[in-house]
Amino acid sequence: MRLGLLGGSFNPVHNGHLAIARQAREALGLDQILFIPTKHPPHKPNGSLAPAQDRYEMVRLAIASDPSLAISDVEIRRPGKSYSIDTVRLLQQEYGAQTQLFFLIGLDAFLDFPSWREPRTLLELCRFVVLSRPGLLFRSLSTVPLLPPIPVPSLMDLDAERISRIEAPLGTQGLICLKLPPSAVSASDIRTRIRQGLPMANLLPPSVESYILQHHLYQEDRNRTNS
């Protein structure tokens, strides 16, 4: 089985997240994408973070009709902060050695990868897939520690969309840089719209929008602007 791991705060999960998951699954030939909501993201301030159980439930509702998308509560049920190394080890035990893990991560987050807990070990446990992010260039990877030398012209070709992916040796699993269509949807923008009472304009799955309104999420402090 080829399993994509998509972690995040999903605060809230939105149509952009779903599009990224489906596009990555198709581009990489994955059997399934596993959404992994974080309980306490170690690299983000709590700010306007909704309760973990609410964020989990919103993801569950969002993917309910798509069997190619699944959800794990591995980080929700674990006490303390959510570190990727712990999550990957637990998922390896759960799914077994026959499952190949693909760690999907945005370019913005991957630039901080050397500061993560046990980054070198992570590179031995799963294959990293770095996804394009609006406003960021893949050629910035040329200065990231721990990475193999990737030819800058190839990174520039990826930025210019002359190619759609690059594969490079990294750890025992390898690295994939994948250019996806840009998404204009932002969780922080959605939270702002909710606080201001603005319509969602098809930014959220209907079930998620209903859940937010029913449980009065993201409305407690209309002056808060944390992203």
Where do the protein language model's features map onto the residues?
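Nucleotidyltransferase catalytic core that binds NTPs
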Residues: 1-227
